[in-house]
Amino acid sequence: MNTKGKVVGVNGNLVTIEVEGSVSMNEVLFVKTGGRNLKAEVIRVRGNEVDAQVFELTKGISVGDLVEFTDKLLTVELGPGLLTQVYDGLQNPLPELAIKCGFFLERGVYLRPLNKDKKWNFKKTSKVGDSVIAGDFLGFVIEGTVHHQIMIPFYKRDSYKIVEIVNDGDYSIDEQIAVIEDDSGMRHSITMSFHWPVKIPITNYKQRLIPSEPMLTQTRIIDTFFPVAKGGTFCIPGPFGAGKTVLQQVTSRNADVDIVIIAACGERAGEVVETLKEFPELIDPKTGKSLMDRTCIICNTSSMPVAAREASVYTAITIGEYYRQMGLDILLLADSTSRWAQAMREMSGRLEEIPGEEAFPAYLESVIASFYERAGIVVLNNGDIGSVTVGGSVSPAGGNFEEPVTQATLKVVGAFHGLTRERSDARKFPAISPLESWSKYKGVIDSKKTEYVRSFLVKGNEINQMMKVVGEEGISNEDFLIYLKSELLDSCYLQQNSFDSIDAAVNSERQNYMFDIVYNILKTNFEFSDKLQARDFINELRQNLLDMNLSSFKDSKFNKLEHTLSELVNFKKVI
């Protein structure tokens, strides 16, 4: 029999409950009020009293209301049908909720995440008599553009033998597709779907690898200077309006991955609506089908209950780990982890815990670290390799990178793409600061070359600061030329037009080709009689390079521009 209790205190979305029986941490419960059952999660246990965070508005809950515990942790349902879906933080399908409730979501309405009526064409890849363990494949169904493997549920801890398996055909997620038997002779029925707790990492693999293979985003500044590896982690901190969301959307469109999961936790609803409108219309260059076919969106906007923000982050990473177990490459984009941290701060305050810096909980760093640590590249039991790459945007107030959430994130991620107000105000997009950002991963271009090129940016910035004080006349022609070359590199290689059909996505071959052209210009010595002549010449080179960026790779226009560029360089270079 499930544990019962009654409400003895309400503070915002924190409810204190007196229980009769045993309760465990993170257990799901329902508060019965006004004819509705409101979902909540246990976050503290003290004797016969527990504190629970309610995932809904707590208006109307009063002392004495009955509470029923489920004896289950907060879980997600895993199975075919997750892709193309839009869920809230508790994995309720929002399109179905809209049909049931209309424009405004009602409290206490929870729907099944997966469609129980849809038939999936199952093709078996194992047979009766095979020995299996948790995570092994029984067969697959085609879901969008991926082979969705049907696996032995991850909570099965023993070794089993298949005693029954259905023939190829159409089945729903609740129909039995196999029966397995353990060593004691007990039989277990297997369907296409099962549940898994969101806060427990999925570890049914042989070993973890160190991320080394670059995950191409087709954004030049990232792939060349601040690369991200498959199975790695990165963060995009930046002030409001610096282009975090656009950069994440461009990355999700063009990244070299099989599946993209977008966790919109606490961001404005308008940005999510933009994604929902654009993604079905965008064509995936790898498959020629809609981008939505390989995307799952977990949407918990700023207008939804605060407590579900934390759940949305964990729901997203659990779905990502599930698809990783099929040998696929997953990209998870969390926008924004600051809102999740603010939700933690709110709950910590209500629990009357000792606050840390800026009133965030003292355990903020360990919680953020435990989330990013669930990224990784792994070797599965059958030898396949799957990865989850996690990118979180951070929204520090006023673009201050010294605040606790940014600092806690920087300690655990492998790449830092810092957006600055200075670059976004100058309309230099993507507004990633080439001086403050860094990456621990290997990129598509030789590191010796990139270090040499970055040195130009550093020198150019120093000369620019000097010019602000003494003016152009106060510096030598050689220094002015270094400054002009750094500006050429910035405008022609670091900046990219996300709304141009050609420049929005640049593959590694083109990146290498264009980088070599810019690299050779930087290494070439030029001599000019005065600064005006130098500026005119570099501006001419810059315009040629910008026109090349907007031309199809190696077509007649591109080749003509390249020929003109090389003639200009050869004419002015000092031998």
Curated annotation (Swiss-Prot):
UniProt keyword Nucleotide-binding, yes or no: yes
Family matches, as Pfam families: ATP-synt_ab, ATP-synt_ab_N, ATP-synt_ab_Xtn, ATP-synt_VA_C
Catalytic activity: ATP + H2O + 4 H(+)(in) = ADP + phosphate + 5 H(+)(out)
GO biological process, alphabetically ordered: proton motive force-driven plasma membrane ATP synthesis
Keywords, alphabetical: ATP synthesis, ATP-binding, Hydrogen ion transport, Ion transport, Nucleotide-binding, Translocase, Transport
HAMAP family named among the record's database cross-references: ATP_synth_A_arch (MF_00309)
Entry protein name: V-type ATP synthase alpha chain
Source organism of this protein record: Borreliella afzelii (strain PKo)
